[in-house]
């Protein structure tokens, strides 16, 4: 059991206050702080005493990961745990399946495109299912809304320039229709795209400001989000995705699980995110980074996503999120001096503190203290530690394992 130094990522959409306030560092921070990575991804591995976790694992993979994990996933940690702080909307994006990632990575490797080239879509051959758990109110767009519901919104919006495209949707073949509609919109020439975005912006602004009785609350929230996206990315056709995707306003402790091919864009808030150990992102707009619409469309799932909220299973101090994959497990725990967390997996684990102060102790005398934003690495070969809140207080921990 050793302290794990997270790798800070300073993307433009990050927040100057969310991570800083959680960690107790200078706030506002000098630059937007977007993510704090706890894992062994080679793009930004966490460190232990200045040495990358990926290197530590490579020294003795079976001791670090355990026989079961190595036999199933190879000699790499199969998950990446993050703190994610969105101060501005993230890009409109999706992630490939394992099969798609392997093929895409091999294709780009064979083409000679450098791994660090900004045009690169596939940074590794891994899929990237992900779970986000809100620590603050957290807004997100995720998965296509059933089009019967979207049709209600478009009827109230009544934007003629948009209606000419949405008329192509056939309720009898919603999936194929959504594919055609989305592909058409994100492929519009720049001039036509800007004109359409501005027309919808005008219509949306009138509705949001006047709030007529026919505008349901959920419609108001979607249109308000659209206006925010247009303000952040003027003329970006990706903003129109807000009209097609489910809108979620998560409260602390609530979560979303997104499998491969699910279109999404996180908007605002602080959360704990866990995913397969990948940095593959296919973008369709709302970003200054590389956008590859044909590749994004190729991996997208256009069926409606009706239930991205994962089920949970209560445990002694919180709950575990029940997920349909083997790459990672995540549970949330609220501790006191009496209510403790015992790490029992036969594989590796990372324990992250998000509030209060906690202390861990293991057979043999190893101890550690955790404050918000701090984590410990527990290799498979180490004695199994137990965590409790310090000094009679309370603490919240997230326990990631395989």
Task: Give the residues covered by each predicted segment.
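Transition-metal
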Residues: 1-213, 288-306, 330
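Generic C-terminus detector
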Residues: 88, 357-402
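A short hydrophobic beta-strand segment most commonly corresponding to one strand
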Residues: 90, 131-137, 269-288, 328, ...
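Short acidic-glycine-tyrosine-enriched beta hairpin
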Residues: 247-258, 262-266, 272, 362-383
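C-terminal, non-catalytic macromolecule-binding modules
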Residues: 269-320
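Conserved short histidine dyad/triad with adjacent acidic residue
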Residues: 314-316, 326-345, 372, 381
């Amino acid at each position: 059991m050793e302290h794990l130094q997270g790798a800070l990522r300073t993307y433009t959409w990050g927040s100057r206050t969310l991570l800083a306030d959680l960690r107790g560092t200078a706030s506002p921070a000098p630059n937007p702080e977007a993510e704090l990575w706890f894992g062994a991804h080679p793009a930004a591995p966490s460190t232990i005493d200045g040495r990358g976790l990926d290197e530590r694992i490579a020294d003795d993979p079976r001791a670090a990961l355990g026989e079961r994990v190595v036999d199933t996933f190879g000699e790499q940690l199969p998950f990446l745990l993050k703190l994610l702080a969105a101060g501005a909307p993230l890009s409109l994006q999706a992630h490939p399946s394992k099969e798609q990632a392997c093929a895409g990575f091999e294709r780009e490797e064979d083409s000679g495109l450098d791994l660090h080239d900004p045009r690169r879509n596939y940074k590794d051959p891994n899929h990237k299912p992900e779970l986000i758990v809100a620590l603050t109110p957290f807004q997100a767009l995720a998965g296509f809304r059933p089009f019967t519901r979207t049709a209600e919104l478009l009827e109230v919006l009544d934007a003629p320039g948009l209606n000419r495209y949405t008329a192509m949707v056939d309720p009898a073949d919603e999936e194929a229709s959504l594919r055609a509609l989305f592909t058409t919109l994100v492929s519009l020439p720049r001039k036509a795209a800007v004109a359409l975005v501005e027309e919808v912006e005008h219509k949306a602004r009138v509705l949001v400001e006047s709030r007529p009785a026919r505008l349901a609350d959920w419609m108001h929230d979607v249109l308000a989000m659209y206006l925010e996206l247009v303000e952040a990315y003027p003329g970006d056709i990706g903003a129109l995705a807000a009209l097609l995707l489910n809108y979620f306003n998560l409260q602390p402790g609530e979560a979303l699980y997104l499998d491969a091919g699910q279109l999404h864009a996180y908007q605002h808030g602080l959360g704990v995110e866990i995913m397969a150990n990948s940095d593959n992102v296919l973008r369709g707009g709302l970003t200054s980074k590389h956008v590859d619409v044909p590749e994004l469309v190729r991996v997208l799932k256009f069926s409606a996503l009706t239930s991205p909220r994962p089920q949970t299973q209560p445990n002694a101090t919180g709950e575990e999120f029940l997920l349909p994959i083997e790459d990672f497990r995540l549970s949330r725990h609220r501790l006191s001096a009496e209510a403790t967390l015992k790490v029992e997996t036969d594989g590796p684990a990372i324990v992250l503190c998000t509030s209060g102060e906690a202390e861990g102790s293991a057979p043999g005398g190893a101890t550690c203290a955790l404050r918000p934003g701090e984590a410990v690495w527990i290799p498979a070969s180490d004695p199994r530690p137990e965590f409790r809140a310090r000094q009679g207080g309370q603490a919240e921990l997230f326990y990631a394992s395989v």
